[in-house]
Amino acid sequence: MAKILKFDEDARRALERGVNKLADTVKVTIGPKGRNVVIDKKFGAPTITNDGVTIAREVEVEDPYENLGAQLVKEVATKTNDIAGDGTTTATVLAQALVREGLKNVAAGASPALLKKGIDAAVAAVSEDLLATARPIDEKSDIAAVAALSAQDQQVGELIAEAMDKVGKDGVITVEESNTFGLELDFTEGMAFDKGYLSPYFVTDQERMEAVLDDPYILINQGKISSIADLLPLLEKVIQANASKPLLIIAEDLEGEALSTLVVNKIRGTFNAVAVKAPGFGDRRKAMLQDMAVLTGATVISEEVGLKLDQVGLEVLGTARRITVTKDDTTIVDGAGKRDEVQGRIAQIKAEIENTDSDWDREKLQERLAKLAGGVCVIKVGAATEVELKERKHRLEDAISATRAAVEEGIVSGGGSALVHAVKVLEGNLGKTGDEATGVAVVRRAAVEPLRWIAENAGLEGYVITSKVADLDKGQGFNAATGEYGDLVKAGVIDPVKVTRSALENAASIASLLLTTETLVVEKKEEEEPAAGGHSHGHSH
């Protein structure tokens, strides 16, 4: 496959044009008065959104050189979204400004390597300053303000604060589509999984068609149980110990005589047991069973660890305060597992989340984490049309991510003002000289861009606003929604510091790489082959 090359200034200018095309598309959405972007979809209705990363993912530029620049900025938005879940538009605007300012200096003869050093030092100093000025949040009202600002909707803010309050900061909040118009909150306490009873005869509450077990024993078996001979020794021990105590059996499957024996005993009233299938498949099933075991103080019975069902005693059984089993779901509330073991398991899952590259794996691990940490909240969202529903769901997901980030590292004043104040630490160019000092100055000039575009989108003169904000004290800034200057934290205009910090760090990372680029290599487009049968040889028919 032949390649075509572009060198030096030409190469960098082409990259910059690509960066600008993508950033100009995204930056119309920034701020409370930002606009939306409509994205055509091959199938179904178009998507209307103001989410930077969603827009960035859809942009492909025709010119292959420019497309390289656009793809690099897409990386900024995606990475910021992965780390902080929001702030993707801010990151894109910063990347564009850093590239523009940096390339001016490279064209004027500055050394790209020294510029990069200056930019890196400046970003580190600004990040440190942002973290130092961040205010931790634990008040419900603060959480509501962060979420409301991200989703641009007060009701959403209050709902997310309510959900956070219920599940704690490690709990999972998921967003589902509903058939009604408004927003609803559903809370499931304890560990729930999507498998119900294997036979309707297990039901204890006929009206609600559910089996409720108070203070039960819990048996977790990795394989299938089909022969009653395997189960009988343990059942006898349970009945001897406490005949009135119910038993929940979680296994890959329970069939044949093993199931029928349990059902017969239940109907006769001699013994109350409920059997459910284990959730998930393969390795994920093993991991989920182990989670349940840790939560309830049970031991997973499997051949792998040398445990056989017909040889174990009561010590392998776990307990919980209450278990509710419906046709489709099982919920374990207040498992009797040891606190430190549960914490250890939570830490292990958190480490796995940090190390995974797959979004799907990360989502599944988050779910497991929440189930261990004590609950799941589902926010159900509805809308009049499919297009509006997608847009609302997206805004909700962003707001949840922003709120998590805020709880983790704290908040700074929003509306782009935190960066304007934070770059004041760069005033002496950090004692750098020459091209490194120029690199520091590049960051100083670029950092005002998010505020500038928030103002421009509100129909105002951007640079006038940025210089006014720079003269104010820390925490003060411009509120584009009301058009007033003042204490932004009090006004509820706040950003999670993690979002602002990640946006700047990721933008600088890509921009400084782009400045040090000298050559572009792209594949040559192959000429279209003429369609077969296109040559006429003049045969008369």
From Swiss-Prot:
Gene Ontology annotations for the cellular component aspect, listed alphabetically: GroEL-GroES complex
Example GO molecular function: isomerase activity
Record bears the keyword Ribonucleoprotein: no
InterPro entries named in the record: Chaperonin_Cpn60_CS, Cpn60/GroEL, Cpn60/GroEL/TCP-1, GroEL-like_apical_dom_sf, GROEL-like_equatorial_sf, TCP-1-like_intermed_sf
Cellular compartment(s): Cytoplasm
Binding-site residues for ATP, renumbered to this chain: 29-32, 86-90, 415, 479-481, 495
The EC number(s) this enzyme carries: 5.6.1.7
Main location group: cytoplasm
Tree of life domain: Bacteria
Keywords assigned by UniProt, alphabetized: ATP-binding, Chaperone, Cytoplasm, Isomerase, Nucleotide-binding
Catalyzed chemical reaction(s): ATP + H2O + a folded polypeptide = ADP + phosphate + an unfolded polypeptide
GO term, biological process aspect, one: protein refolding
Family as reported in the entry's similarity comment: Belongs to the chaperonin (HSP60) family.
Record's function text: Together with its co-chaperonin GroES, plays an essential role in assisting protein folding. The GroEL-GroES system forms a nano-cage that allows encapsulation of the non-native substrate proteins and provides a physical environment optimized to promote and accelerate protein folding.
NCBIfam families xref list: GroEL, PRK00013.1, PRK12849.1, PRK12850.1, PRK12851.1
Subunit organization: Forms a cylinder of 14 subunits composed of two heptameric rings stacked back-to-back. Interacts with the co-chaperonin GroES.
Name this protein carries in UniProt: Chaperonin GroEL 1
Species, as recorded: Streptomyces coelicolor (strain ATCC BAA-471 / A3(2) / M145)
Protein's gene: groEL1
